[in-house]
Amino acid sequence: MGCVSMTLGIDEAGRGCLAGSLFVAGVACNEKTALEFLKMGLKDSKKLSLKKRFFLEYKIKTHGEVGFFVVKKSANEIDSLGLGACLKLAVQEILENGCSLVDEIKIDGNTAFGLNKRYPHIQTIIKGDETIAQIAMASVLAKAFKDREMLELHALFKEYGWDKNCGYGTKQHIEAIIKLGATPFHRHSFTLKNRILNPKLLEVEQRLI
């Protein structure tokens, strides 16, 4: 990759889901390569179609001048360790693998999870997936992994609408949990916290509002 300045962008997908894994991705490349991806239509993954995300994922993974890392934390790990700890561990793993390759590290959001003491050149950027190409590339990669996981799980549990909601707490998804209960792929710490698994309590609360 030569001596050209390299930037590592980090972003996640699945943070606020009720089901499935958290995926954290890191993508490292120089500005010339980043520009190539912007010309391909790269932007914040939430603004791309599923087909376009999978297309860009393929391009990221097969480009000779791009380094990439994806870390998965399962629903069980999130329940055991907590979401914050899982995010930190995933970011840390990416930094340990990618830090030596790059000159700059840019993380989407407003926290470096305390890792800026060990990696002082980390920058946190709110809505970084809208302004930094490498973060947008990481966003696409993480979201594509999350999309694929939930499509595969949807084949096993069609009633929860995971092909459409991707594990997020939509009305249909919550109603399915109330009616059918949670699957082994649900984050029980999330569903219990939101009182979803106790519909009687939920009805009482609605009457109190």
Swiss-Prot record:
Binding locations of a divalent metal cation: D11, E12, D108
Disulfide bonds: none
Keywords in alphabetical order: Cytoplasm, Endonuclease, Hydrolase, Manganese, Metal-binding, Nuclease
Reported cofactor(s): Mn(2+); Mg(2+)
The EC number(s) this enzyme carries: 3.1.26.4
Positions of the RNase H type-2 domain: 5-202
GO cellular component, one term: cytoplasm
Pfam families the UniProt entry points to: RNase_HII (PF01351)
The reaction(s) this protein catalyses: Endonucleolytic cleavage to 5'-phosphomonoester
Keyword Hydrolase in annotation: yes
One BP term from GO: mismatch repair
GO molecular function: manganese ion binding; RNA binding; RNA-DNA hybrid ribonuclease activity
Domain of life of the organism encoding this protein: Bacteria
Localization in the cell: Cytoplasm
Record HAMAP family: RNase_HII_B
NCBIfam families linked to this entry: PRK00015.1-3 (NF000595), PRK14550.1 (NF011119)
Similarity comment: Belongs to the RNase HII family.
Job description of the protein: Endonuclease that specifically degrades the RNA of RNA-DNA hybrids.
Protein name from the UniProt record: Ribonuclease HII
Protein species of origin: Helicobacter pylori (strain ATCC 700392 / 26695) (Campylobacter pylori)
Gene designation per UniProt: rnhB
